[in-house]
Amino acid sequence: MMVFWIGLNILVTEALRTLLGTDVPAWAVLLASSGPLYVVAMPLSMLAFTRVPVIRTRQYPMKAGEFIQIFVMCIPVMFLGNMIGNILSAGATDGQATNRINDVILGSDWRVNALFIGLLAPVCEEWIFRKEIISRLRRYGEKTAIIFSALAFALFHMNVFQFFYAFGLGLMFGYVYTRTSRLRYSVAMHMLINLNGSVLAPLVIQQIDPRILDGTVSEAEIMRMAEAGNMGDMGIMMLYGTVMLGLCIAGIVLLITKRKSWEFYLAPEELPAGLKIRTAYANPGVIAYLLLTVMLTGWMLFA
C-alpha cells in the first residue's frame, strides 16, 4: 500500500507542477496525496488483508456518556503527543524542522480541509487501521492488536510531529473499536479531532492580527488596542484556548479516575507473552513496512 501510494503521489504531484508550475494550490496538494491513497492504495491493501481471516465478534452500542468521556480523554493524549513530537523534532534539527501538514492546512480553504482531512481521512484510516487490522489480529490478543494498529497508524503519517499523538489516539480509537466492534464511534471521534485541528483552530487563528502571533507588536500597541476595544478577535482565541484547556484538564482527571475500568478479554488464540512481539512484528511484511515508514519519517524530518 505504501509503495503504491508514495509512487502515485510523486507522479501526480510532478504532473501538477508541470501543468501549474510552482503555483500549485493547496487543494491540489491534498488531492495529489489523498486521491492515490483512497482510490488505489487502500483498496489494493485488501489483497493482503484477505489472506488473514476476520474473527467475528458481537457488536455493542456505546452510550453517549461513554462516548463523551473517552473523547475528552483523547484531548490530553493529543496535546501530550503533540508536545513530544514538537520537542523531538526541534531537538533533532536544531529548531529547523517545520510541520508541513500545518503549512498545508493553513494555506488551504477550510472547506477543502473539512472534506479531505475532517471527513475522508477519518473514514478511510479507521477502516484500514481499526476495522481491517484489529478485526484480523484480535484473535491473538486484544492488547497486541490495539498496539499494532496504533503503531501502524502512527508510522503511516511519516511525520515526527504527528507520530506520538497519532500513536496515543490510535490506542484510544483501537480500544473503542475493540469494545464495540462498531467503526462509527472511532470514526466520529477521529472526525471531531481532525475538524478541530484542520478547520476550527485555523479559523480562530486567522481572526488574529499576524503581528500578535509572531510577536512583532509591542506591549504598548497591544495596550492601545485593548483600550480602543479592538481585542475582540483575541477574545475568541482566548475563549477557544480556555475551552481546550478545560477539556484537557477534564481528560487528565478522567484518565486517572477511570484507569481501572479499561476492560480486556482473553482472545481465542491468545499468544503467550514471549511470542507476541515476535509473531506480530518479526515477519517480512511488517519489517518492510517498519523500515520504509521509519526511513521516510526521517527523510521528511531532515529534508
Per-region residue spans from a language model:
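Membrane-helix interface segments in multi-pass membrane proteins
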Residues: 6-37, 82-109, 161, 202-242, ...
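Transmembrane helix-loop-helix hairpins at the membrane interface
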Residues: 111-302
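Alpha-helical transmembrane segments of polytopic integral membrane proteins
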Residues: 8-9, 13, 41-46, 77, ...
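Membrane-helix interface linkers and caps
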Residues: 14-22, 26-72, 96, 249-273
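Alpha-helical transmembrane segments
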Residues: 1-9, 69-78, 285-294
